[in-house]
């Protein structure tokens, strides 16, 4: 074989190899995407505690991964929940979604021992901060709030401070819930002040320092009717909204309050949703995306491989959210259609 033929053969082989690599990547991308065909939104895993983030024209959705284990339905004392990791999904149009897999686990914190409970991810100055609930080991032995950081919305995330941000001894001013320090939510107000809210049994509120990884001042409490857990902060126009899981008739509903500033006063506005189907808990996540507002939440209607939904096997859903002229939010009916294209 002369040198010209050898070069041609090498180029053909390289082209064929490149095509194989491209085909493999394309197939993988297709395997990691799915179409929104109604609620529940995610149908191949049990998911809970949705937390949306909009960044650069893409909506990222962070959820806890509920995983079934033998004997789960007879467990008690919080052991009904087996939430092993946080997953991330993304979309540019609310219809086609990409599954980015696991982006953080409780054991990614050296002091964490398990339980990937409710969280929120925010972006600030090119960094992504993951405020989250973790079961901590010694010397804490309780639910705490940690913070991880990444250069990308899909991770990897690493512990930002090497210890919990908020622990039990810091919140003794609240009426004791099952777990004081769970379900963090973040907002940056119009003055550039960062705030964090969280709680179970009591709704806590605190300022953050400009580095977003230290509290700034005292931890306050917000008196909200029937507050249970799962606060979510957002702003629309001149109003701030504090939406949360409230106690309904035996199960949780979503209620909310509004205020002219993060310092209050907070005015209760009643229920935003009824109880979630087949689920004791419900958890709000509210965001504006592509000119529309959305409420993410979870129920427990998904059946997966013959395993039915339950208190610890939930399924994330989404509905469009509408406002009245006075800024109050219209009651949201939970549907099977959700926001799927018709």
Language model region names:
Residues 1, 24-25:
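Extracellular attachment fibers and their assembly/anchoring modules
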Residues 1-2, 342:
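Accessible peptide chain termini
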Residues 2-13:
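Bacterial N-terminal signal peptides that target proteins for export
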Residues 13-21:
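Bacterial N-terminal signal peptides
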Residues 25-342:
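Carbohydrate-active catalytic/glycan-binding domains of CAZyme proteins
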């Amino acid at each position: 074989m002369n040198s010209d033929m050898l070069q041609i053969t090498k180029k053909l082989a390289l082209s064929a190899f490149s095509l194989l690599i491209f085909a493999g990547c394309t197939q993988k991308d297709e395997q990691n995407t799915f179409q929104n065909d109604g609620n529940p939104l995610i149908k191949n895993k049990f998911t809970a505690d949705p937390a949306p983030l909009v960044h650069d024209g893409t909506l990222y959705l962070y959820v806890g991964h509920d995983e079934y284990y033998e004997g789960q339905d007879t467990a008690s004392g919080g052991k009904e929940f087996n939430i092993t990791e946080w997953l991330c999904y993304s979309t540019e149009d609310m219809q086609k979604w990409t599954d980015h897999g696991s982006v953080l686990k409780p054991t990614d914190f050296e002091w964490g021992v398990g339980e990937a409970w409710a969280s929120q991810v925010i972006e600030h100055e090119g960094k992504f901060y993951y405020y989250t609930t973790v079961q901590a080991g010694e010397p804490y032995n309780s639910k705490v709030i940690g913070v991880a950081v990444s250069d990308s919305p899909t991770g990897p995330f690493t512990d930002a401070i090497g210890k919990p941000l908020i622990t039990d001894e810091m919140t003794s001013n609240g009426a004791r819930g099952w777990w004081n320090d769970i379900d963090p939510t973040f907002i940056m107000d119009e003055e550039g002040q960062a705030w964090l809210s969280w709680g179970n049994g009591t709704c806590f509120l605190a300022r953050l320092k400009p580095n977003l990884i230290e509290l700034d001042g005292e931890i306050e409490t917000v008196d909200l009717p029937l507050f249970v857990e799962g606060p979510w902060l957002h702003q629309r126009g001149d109003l701030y909204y504090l939406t949360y899981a409230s106690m309904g008739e035996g199960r949780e509903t979503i209620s909310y309050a509004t205020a002219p500033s993060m310092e209050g006063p907070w005015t209760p506005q009643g229920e935003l949703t009824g109880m979630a189907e087949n689920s004791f808990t419900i958890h709000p996540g509210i965001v504006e995306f592509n000119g529309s507002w959305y409420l993410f939440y979870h129920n427990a209607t998904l059946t997966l491989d013959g395993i039915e939904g339950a208190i610890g096997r939930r399924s994330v859903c989404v509905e469009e959210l509408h406002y009245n002229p006075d800024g109050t939010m219209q009651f949201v009916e939970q549907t099977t259609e959700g926001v799927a294209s018709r």
